[in-house]
Design a protein with these regions (language model features):
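Formylglycine-dependent sulfatase
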Residues: 10, 14, 20-388, 392, ...
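Predominantly extracellular/luminal cell-surface or secreted proteins
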Residues: 271, 310, 543-547, 602-604
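Short carbohydrate-recognition loop motifs
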Residues: 491-510
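Exposed low-complexity, polar/acidic, P/S/T/G-rich flexible segments that act as propeptides
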Residues: 591-609
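Extracellular beta-strand-rich recognition modules
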Residues: 582-588
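Bacterial N-terminal signal peptides that target proteins for export
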Residues: 1-8
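Extracellular carbohydrate-recognition regions
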Residues: 466-490, 610
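Extracellular ligand-binding interfaces
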Residues: 504-577, 588-595
Length: 610
């Protein structure tokens, strides 16, 4: 299929004139696990500093409702680089790679129009040990960017990467070659991008720069780390430092374009690949404020990210664009600007005439998602989320409550209409239809979302649920009652002879177990006391949020170390909260199991929850 497509494009290229000087260069910068709040221009968090990205927003367009196609790395990247919903070719989640070689990337699409292309940084579209079912990990080299139309590449997230050229742009013999650079990841990735721009300044180019930031492992790169606010938790400071390093690299790229006289002939996109992940353990560096949910969810916190475009002299400076757009639009925009004929396989739209006011209305009537056991659709106002066959959520995105109030019971006709449209879209996908069986991790995500926001899930009687769901619900209710309102996440909590045993789930990287309580009303400061025993030493963390905070923040955490002991140990932590504490988490490391008892919370006004 791919060879036929390539021959057709070659025929078009041979019949077409040489590449026009009017063809703009196109740069796509993709960040990693970069929450909506962590762009200072969003004005969502006072601690973030992104002067160069802010300059992009000032000199270009900030899309405040910019979406990606999935709340996870691999499918999001597959969607943006092809311009097609990744479900059409089977890359639905991180376990479903690699990107099929038959799929046409932006680089391959632009090549017949005279473009030279490069990929830098995280690729994540090759086979891995987790995708053995689709392609052997040992065959990863056959799926690197060079096999997908990129003329040059430096492919890898960290300090070791596969490359076609060295960082000075000299071709390597028998590529790909494995290279190592000891500097912080963003630094060498920026250098590779600058080298490519310098050497191809006189021909149209496409650069896909995928910074591996601020994704874990969190690091403390200097000099950026020293500039972060010292009062913040370590993980937050590390994320801010990593974002600052990326931001500085983007500033170098913008400066190089100006120095080469290319800024008015270069369209630059900046997009985050998905929302920030769960803010506990090593994953709490970035923030999604004020959005709800996180990476792994189809609420806006998982799929609505920083989204900018800059093209001086063509795009209006300082424009804040309100209608929803999606990462699929990058490929369609690039193809149109390259002068290629319209291709119905592309599922995005050319954004330029909409942003310039040459086309009226919104670029999209509807946007769709299907990921794991979740599916969603949104129009200009409403968003419907289906969680398997178990739950439905209808959100009014134009209301102050947003995704914290389920309007399903209030607007059943709206929900029915959106569900019909979602079903129609899903019928066109392979395999057709909506996911029905509920994924356990998705249940954890949405249970926590319900706990945090108070949003009401679909009202069902016990008899409405399938047998497996009824059994799960009954077990969950029994555990919750026995634990006096404490609920476990990333683990199981059971009671035996007056002792609560927290058993963590193995094999989940950086997702430590925690117990959580919501529905509180404790005046700060709040004191946690508990007794524990365990065969492994560790560090216990207390996180909290008040009624004035829509989500947990890295600042609201306290920690205490404990030893391995067969005896009971008393732990006390004080949350120096001001206001009313409504939700807490008690976090534990990844020990096999921990015994707990006498877990108590006391507020300043002698209120208590045991």
């Amino acid at each position: 299929m791919k060879s036929t497509f390539a021959v057709l494009l070659l025929a078009v290229a041979l019949a077409a004139p040489a590449a026009s000087a009017a063809q703009p260069n196109i740069i796509l910068i993709y960040s990693d696990d970069h929450g909506y709040a962590d762009l200072a221009a969003q004005k969502a968090d006072p601690d973030i500093r992104t002067p160069h990205l802010d300059a992009m927003a000032r000199d270009g367009v900030r899309f405040v409702r910019g979406y990606v196609t999935a709340p996870q790395c691999v499918p999001s990247r597959a969607g943006v680089i092809t311009g097609r919903y990744q479900q059409r070719f089977g890359v639905e989640d991180n376990l479903k790679g690699p990107l099929p070689l038959a799929e046409i990337t932006i680089a391959e699409r632009l090549k017949p129009a005279g473009y030279v292309s490069a990929q830098v940084g995280k690729w994540h579209l090759e086979p891995t040990p987790r995708s053995e079912e689709q392609a052997p990990a040992a065959n990863a080299h056959a799926f690197l960017p060079g096999a997908q139309g990129f003329d040059e590449y430096w492919c890898g997230p960290m300090n070791t990467f596969m490359a076609s050229h060295d960082l000075q742009g000299r071709p390597l013999s028998n590529p790909p070659q494995r290279l190592t650079d000891p500097r912080f990841r963003c630094v060498w990735q920026t250098d590779a991008a600058l080298s490519f721009i310098d050497r191809h300044a006189r021909e149209p180019f496409f650069l896909y720069l995928a910074y591996f930031t601020p994704h874990v492992p969190l690091q403390s790169p200097e000099p950026w780390f020293a500039r972060t606010p010292a009062h913040l938790p370590l993980e937050r400071r590390q994320a801010l430092a990593m974002i600052a390093a990326m931001d500085e690299g983007i500033g170098q790229i913008r400066a190089r374009l100006r120095a080469l006289g290319l800024e008015k002939n270069t369209l630059v996109f900046f997009i985050g690949d998905n929302g920030a992940p769960l803010k506990q353990g090593a994953w709490n560096g970035s923030l999604n404020t004020p959005l709800t949910g996180e990476k792994g969810m189809l609420t806006d916190g998982g799929i609505r990210t920083p989204f900018l475009a800059e093209w001086p002299g063509t795009l209006p400076a300082g424009k804040v664009y309100e209608p929803p757009v999606i990462s699929l639009d990058v490929a369609a925009t690039a193809a149109a600007l390259a002068g290629l004929p319209p291709d119905p396989a592309l599922e995005g739209v050319n954004l330029i005439p909409f942003v310039r006011g040459e086309k009226s209305g919104a670029p999209h009537d509807l946007l769709y998602w299907r990921w794991r056991s979740q599916a969603a659709v949104r129009d200009a106002r409403w968003k419907l989320i289906l969680l398997g066959k178990e739950e439905k959520f209808l959100f009014d995105l134009e209301s102050p409550e947003g995704e914290t109030k389920n309007r399903l019971a209030d607007f059943p006709a709206v929900a029915a209409d959106l569900e019909k449209k979602l079903m129609g879209w899903n019928a066109t996908l392979p395999p057709p239809g909506l996911p029905r069986e509920l994924n356990a991790q998705d249940q954890i995500f949405y249970d926590d979302h319900v706990l945090q926001t108070g949003v009401k899930a679909t009202k069902r009687t016990a008899g409405d649920r399938p047998a497996a769901a009824r059994k799960k619900a009954a077990a969950t209710a029994a555990t919750t009652n026995a634990a006096q309102g404490w609920t476990a996440r990333n683990g199981t909590l059971t009671e035996r002879d007056g002792v609560l045993e927290l058993r963590t789930e193995g094999g989940r990287r950086a997702a430590n177990a925690f117990i959580t309580r919501t529905g509180l009303a404790l005046a700060g400061p709040v004191t946690l006391t508990l007794r524990l025993r365990t065969a492994q030493p560790g560090r216990l963390g207390l996180a909290w949020r008040t009624d004035a905070q829509p989500d947990f923040t890295p600042e609201n955490q306290k920690f205490a170390d404990y030893a391995a002991s067969a005896d009971w140990q008393a732990i006390t932590l004080v949350a120096p909260a001001t206001g009313k504490v409504i939700h807490v988490r008690v976090q534990f490391p990844s020990a096999d199991s921990i015994d707990l008892r006498q877990i108590e919370l006391h507020g300043a006004a002698a209120t208590s929850n045991k």
